[in-house]
Amino acid sequence: MTRGVKSKAQRRGQAPPPPKRSPWLERGLFGLAAITVVVVGAGLWRMSGDDRTTSATDAGPVHVHGLGVNPLDGALFIATHTGLFRSGGGESTSARVGDSSQDTMGFTIVDADRFLGSGHPDLRTDLPPLLGLIESTDRGRSWEPIALLGEADFHVLRSAGEVVYGYDSSNDRLMVSGDAGRTWEEVERPAPLVDLAADPKDSQHVVAAGVSDISQGLYESRDGGRSWDRRGEQVGLLAWPAPGRLFLVDGGGNVFLSTDTGRRFGRRGTIGGQPAALLGQGADELFVALHDGTIKRSTDGGSTWTIRSTP
């Protein structure tokens, strides 16, 4: 099932590091880690059944990797180490989608009922340990491999129309697809990535947060990741939901907003904990996952937060 991978030539050198070690590595939130998969539940491929299937022993979404809102019904989807969960509008808890415990590391909703993911399979399948890019068109109940099966593990996965960006942590490479994930090209990455966000007006304009053993920084590309300029030392989870609204949440839970694509940031508020995932919807609506599985929501650009969902 693997399709069209083209290699990039020599990478450029990284920017000079600041003197102190990256707090992202010290916190252990990011970096290149060993693959771990937890066995809970049944196989995921060609699964059927209701959106909301769970059991009394299900711990819920306690190790969150990604968030998405289905534009069809406004439901919040929570991608975790042990499966995909859904919290409908007006609900304060979430329920497992199907009965799979797939480790969904990368997750993005590109259109109504169309989800993209990556990560590691439920161990009761016969799939390889790296899922490459997978797609669901039934709200996460079943998934099909699209590309790079057995070859890539996208810990960062972002879509901008037909353009999809993925950071493959297993091979420390940034990849881009111009055809919704069917074929991929390896492009230059400025550093091992923490996160990436695309300009909602220009899919070739992206900002990335990167971190290495001794350095960290924010980088900007206007050619789809083929070249980069360093913008500063700030690093964190990113969301770019509207033009001129680039949000960053750092490792301490502080929320920042930039109106000039990351050159300058102003502090907005705090989420009250360490962030695990960030999602932007419109100019001022944000969702953030904490490491205990709590999902918070802000409707004022990160100044104040309320609890949207609990495990």
What are the residue ranges of the model-derived segments?
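Short coil/turn segments that connect the beta-strands within blades of beta-propeller domains
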Residues: 72-74, 112-113, 161-162, 203-204, ...
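Short glycine/acidic-enriched loop and turn motifs that connect beta-strands
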Residues: 83-85, 120-126, 171-173, 212-216, ...
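Conserved beta-strand position repeated across blades of beta-propeller domains
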Residues: 68, 107-108, 158, 197-199, ...
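Terminal targeting segments of Actinobacterial cell-envelope proteins
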Residues: 1-24
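Asp-box/BNR beta-propeller loop motif
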Residues: 82-97, 129-147, 175-188, 219-230, ...
